Swiss-Prot record:
It comes from Janthinobacterium sp. (strain Marseille) (Minibacterium massiliensis). InterPro entries: CheD-like_sf, Chemorcpt_Glu_NH3ase_CheD, Cytotoxic_necrot_fac-like_cat. This is Probable chemoreceptor glutamine deamidase CheD. The lineage of its organism: Bacteria, Pseudomonadati, Pseudomonadota, Betaproteobacteria, Burkholderiales. It catalyses: L-glutaminyl-[protein] + H2O = L-glutamyl-[protein] + NH4(+). Its EC number is 3.5.1.44. Belongs to the CheD family. Probably deamidates glutamine residues to glutamate on methyl-accepting chemotaxis receptors (MCPs), playing an important role in chemotaxis. GO terms for molecular function: protein-glutamine glutaminase activity. Gene3D superfamilies: 3.30.1330.200. The keyword Signal does not apply.
Length: 203
């Protein structure tokens, strides 16, 4: 794993008593993958997560990202915004392939893109993120087998890569501002920092 990859790989692994297994919690800008019978969990507002797995081997993972605002047309593959989204997707897919997944067996479930953050662009941030992840997977010929995108509610997503099961809990009321603060901090970091290095997919 390169230094660049390590910077984005989630390190918050704990034992989840509810589901009786190890779990990895991913934050905005992070991703996690595993071949073990684990749980990967995240909370999404405007960000999106792609849960991608090899349906034969059960090797799978999840990312959590948003497109930076102001990078031009998110649909243009050369915009800074699209390059960041592409990086977030490719770093996960590359690590899955390195871990033994086969490209032709990959399937995806995508979540998030809620209308939670405002003030970052004229178009809804969540909608842009949802549109990007759908388009990326279509271009890469990775089938989306389930999705829960857009809406106005944040979501807590529990992903079991070994069998592909996903549980989604809509958070109709937030008890605090942690999620919104986390996403706004992440959006600000994206604005001030440069897009991470290029990653190429291999098959």
């Amino acid at each position: 794993m390169s230094e660049l990859t390590k910077e984005h790989f989630a390190t918050n692994v704990y034992y989840d008593r509810t589901f009786d297994r190890d779990a990895a919690k991913i934050l905005p800008g992070e991703y996690y993958y595993t071949g073990k019978d684990m749980l990967i969990v995240t909370v999404l507002g405007s960000c999106v997560s792609a849960c991608i797995r090899d349906r034969v081997t059960g090797v799978g993972g999840m990312n959590h990202f948003m497109l930076p605002d102001g990078g031009g047309d998110a649909d243009s593959p050369i915009s800074a915004s699209a390059r960041y989204g592409t990086y977030a997707m490719e770093i996960l897919i590359n690590d899955l392939l390195k871990a033994g997944a086969r490209r032709e067996n990959l399937e995806a479930k995508v979540f998030g893109g809620g209308n939670v953050l405002s003030g970052f662009s004229s178009i809804n941030v969540g909608e842009r993120n949802a549109q990007f992840v759908r388009n990326f997977l279509k271009v890469e010929n990775i089938r989306i087998v389930a999705e829960d995108l857009n809406d106005v509610h944040p979501r807590k997503v529990y992903y079991f890569p070994r069998n592909g099961k996903v549980l989604v809990k809509k958070l109709r009321q937030l008890n605090n501002n942690t999620l919104v603060n986390r996403e706004q901090d992440y959006a600000n970091r994206l604005q001030s920092g440069s897009v991470s290095g290029d990653v190429e997919l291999f098959s």
